[in-house]
Amino acid sequence: MLIWQEEAWHTTENKIDIVTGDIKEASHIFGNDSYEVIVSNPPYMIGEHGLKNDNEALYIARHEALCTLDDLLRESAKVLKMKGRFYMVHRPFRLPEIFTKMCNYGIEPKRMRLVHPYADKEPNMVLIEGLKGGKPRLAVDPPLIVYTKDGEYTEEVLKLYGMK
């Protein structure tokens, strides 16, 4: 979520705690069954797949160097309360693996939406919602198109960003 208005930012001041730690230890840091919602933008690339950035921080953010999909889902399943929601943005090429692992950890995929940079391009992102302890049933939302053919944000993206 992007916060565009300063007053919106100030209303969240006392509601956010920033904790620094290893995500592989999340259940030890926060305890089991402690959160109703988890939102994640994890590293997308496995090993050396994709372009390697010389900037170590960017490399770690984009590649599963310190945190794998298994690490994220295992700890999320522990930390989420029953019927808690799990949200993630990832790459479509990993969907079969993502759905398999979510189910293996008891987080049922409930909704997905493919994100296309342009209407005539393949999707490059996928938005996923899961439910801990949910029953099998996946809803597929209409695709989200980010840019018009002229390179401007689409009306929907402008609305999502609070710019319309």
Residue spans for each PLM region:
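Mobile active-site "lid"/loop adjacent to the S-adenosyl-L-methionine
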Residues: 36-37, 42-71
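SAM/dcSAM-binding transferase cores
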Residues: 122-164
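S-adenosyl-L-methionine
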Residues: 3-36
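Conserved Class I SAM-dependent methyltransferase catalytic core
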Residues: 65-117, 121-123, 127
